[in-house]
Structures are given as C-alpha cells and as structure tokens.
Amino acid sequence: MAPKNSSWNPFDDEKEAAKSFSLNPFDDDDDDKEVEKRFTSSLKPSGGKENQTVQELESYAVYNSEETTKTVQGCLKVAEEIRCDASKTLVMLNEQGDQITRTHQKTVDLDHHLSRGEKILGRLGGVFSRTWKPKKSRSITGPVITKGDSPKRKVIDLKTREKLGLNPSLKPKSKTLPEAVDAYQKTQIAKQDEALTDLSALLGELKNMAVDMGTAIERQTNELDHLQDNADELNYRVKQSNQRARYLLRK
C-alpha cells in the first residue's frame, strides 16, 4: 500500500520541513511529554513504524534526534559541575597538605627547644648527683618532601587512557549517514558530536583530577603517620623532663 502524500518529498524544501515537524529542544517538559505521547500513540493503532507515512517517520526521527541532543548536553552539564567540585576539592587538599607540612615543621622547632631544656635539667642536681640523660627512642625529623611532589595535575600515561577510552587521539568510527537524513538532523548530529567530544575531554580531565586526589590523600596519610610518630616521641620526652623537674624540686 502506498503511503499517504506519496508525492510529497520532505527534502525538497528544508524550511517547509522544519515548519512541519521541527521541535524546539528548549520547550517545557510537559510539551515534550505531550509530543512523545502523540508519537507513541500514533504508532500503536496503525501497526507500528512500518505503516507510517514518510512525514510521520521523519518527524519521529527528528524528535528522537532532538531528545538525544538534549540528553548528551545534559550529561556534559553534569560533568562540568563535577569538574567544578573536583577543582575545589583539589584546592582544599593542597591547602590541607600545606597545613600538615607547617605543623610537621613545628615539631622540629619543638625538638630543638626541648633538647636545650633537657641539657639544662641534666646538669642540675648538685655536685654528687648523677648526670641525667633523657631516653630517646627515635630522632625527630621534619616533613619529607618527595621528588615530583607538585600540586600540578599529572598526565595519565597513554596506555591507561586508551584502556579507559579517554584518549583524544582515538577517533570514533565514522558513520555513513543515509541520504534520507535532512539538514536539520545533520545539525543535531553535529551538536551531539561536539558535545560528546567535549564530554570525552572532560572525562579525561576528571580522571586526571581523581588520580591527583588519590595521590594527595596517600601522601598526606603518610605525612600524618610520620607526624604522629614524632608527636608521640616528643610527648614521651616531655613527660621525662617533667619527672626530672619534679625530682629536683623535691630535693
């Protein structure tokens, strides 16, 4: 059976075609639902897509193309918001690392002053008193600065990016567009390709930022462990010095 309006060619006049079935991708959600309902309801009673006219099928294809474009652009927007939050997190991690380093440096200064006090306490007690020396289980060292320790973003090696599918050099397979696709749909596809390219680049950037976060957290965890050891040692030595001072005061 020949479809209705078989003499009508949707590709003769792009303006007329756009007027017939062009949809605004920025319409309200209610309008989108109404359009989708109209498309799906028109397919069921007539026996599916096989029995639709060329104009109806073309209109439905344009609708799906616009929906795909909006979905891809929505994903891109979410990725941009994640990147913004990740950037703030990286800044906070760098500031936290600086605070840990400054605190660690203070333990070195405290060790220097404590050593001077221990020497003075050791000399006190009279001529016949035995020289007192504090017990030290470990030396106090400052923050360890490793090579390549930089807040700058590190670049993931090529193999890792290829495994993740984030290598910008990997181009998607070219798709041959059927001749039936009009200029409007080609415009939508171009928008989708552009958004997908930006999304791919964003995902690669987010992966780099995630690696940087993991590296910073691991480094700071090791620094905190080292700082804890120094703090425990200083606490032990301060207790010894206080005991020595109380002993001298009782004499």
Swiss-Prot record:
Keywords: Coiled coil, Cytoplasm, Membrane, Protein transport, Transport
Signal peptide as annotated in the record: none
Domain of life of the organism encoding this protein: Eukaryota
InterPro entries for the chain: NPSN/SNAP25-like_N_SNARE (IPR044766), T_SNARE_dom (IPR000727)
Span of domain t-SNARE coiled-coil homology: 186-248
GO molecular function, a single term: SNAP receptor activity
Compartments it resides in: Membrane; Cytoplasm
Bilayer disposition of the protein: Peripheral membrane protein
GO biological process, alphabetically ordered: membrane fusion; protein transport; vesicle-mediated transport
Primary subcellular site in the record, as a coarse category: membrane
Gene Ontology CC annotation, any one: SNARE complex
Annotated stretches, region: Disordered: 1-52
Biased composition (Polar residues): 40-52
Family label: Belongs to the SNAP-25 family.
Function noted in UniProt: SNAREs, soluble N-ethylmaleimide-sensitive factor-attachment protein receptors, are essential proteins for fusion of cellular membranes. SNAREs localized on opposing membranes assemble to form a trans-SNARE complex, an extended, parallel four alpha-helical bundle that drives membrane fusion.
Name of this chain's protein: SNAP25 homologous protein SNAP29
Organism annotation: Arabidopsis thaliana
Taxonomic path: Eukaryota, Viridiplantae, Streptophyta, Embryophyta, Tracheophyta
The gene coding this protein: SNAP29
